[in-house]
Structure formats: C-alpha cells, structure tokens
Amino acid sequence: MSLRQNALNAYRNGLRATRIAFGGDTRMLLASRAKMREGMENPPNPELSKEQQIKHLEDVATFLKRNLVQGRKEGTDEKYHLNIHKETELGDNESIKQTKKTLVSQGGGCCGGGKDLYK
C-alpha cells in the first residue's frame, strides 16, 4: 500500500475510534475529530517520519478504543454509569493483588532504618 493510503486508513480508524469512545457525547466527539483533522493537516511532531506519524495515529486510535471509558452521572447521588463497550480492555488487576517485596512493605521503612523494628 502507498503511504497516502496508509495515512488515510489510519485516519479512518481514528475517526471510528472516536465514535466508539465518544459515541454518546457529541461535544467530545466533534472536538476529538477536529483535533484529529488538525493533526493530519499540521502534524504536532513534524520531526518524525511519515511512517512514524501514521504509527502514532494508529496507536492513538487503539488507545481510544481499548482504554478510554466515559462515565455519566446518574441521579443526585454519586453514582456514574460507565460506557464500557465490547472493545474496552478489562484488566484483571493481578499485579496489584500481589504483595510487594520491598523493605517498606515488610516494615523496614525507608532505607532499611526500621528493619529490625518489627521482629
């Protein structure tokens, strides 16, 4: 594929990603699409090669689809409805559940000063 075709495909994927991420929020949808168009016309990092700029746009589209979730406040209490869609990446948080093997987590304090404090 030509460079022009690759750029056009990346732009289209970016527009699709904004529709997925901001589907119910017209203001954000229009703002994100305007920002994307501006970035295509005047690249924010012109020192990068065209291929790197295309790759960056593809990465942004992937991030928008997988990692961005919008919430909308429901009612008067502090409850929000999250717009989680089929492409949202849901982590399992296993790394958070594991205990850390640092001195601080074992009661050692900063720089090991309290290492024998809890024995």
From Swiss-Prot:
One of its GO terms (molecular function) is protein folding chaperone. Keywords: Chaperone, Mitochondrion, Transit peptide. InterPro entries: Complex1_LYR_LYRM7, MZM1/LYRM7. The keyword Transcription does not apply. One of its GO terms (cellular component) is mitochondrial matrix. It is found in: Mitochondrion matrix. It comes from the Eukaryota. The keyword Transit peptide applies. Interacts with RIP1. Assembly factor required for Rieske Fe-S protein RIP1 incorporation into the cytochrome b-c1 (CIII) complex. Functions as a chaperone, binding to this subunit within the mitochondrial matrix and stabilizing it prior to its translocation and insertion into the late CIII dimeric intermediate within the mitochondrial inner membrane. Modulates the mitochondrial matrix zinc pool. Belongs to the complex I LYR family. MZM1 subfamily. This is Mitochondrial zinc maintenance protein 1, mitochondrial. It comes from Zygosaccharomyces rouxii (strain ATCC 2623 / CBS 732 / NBRC 1130 / NCYC 568 / NRRL Y-229).
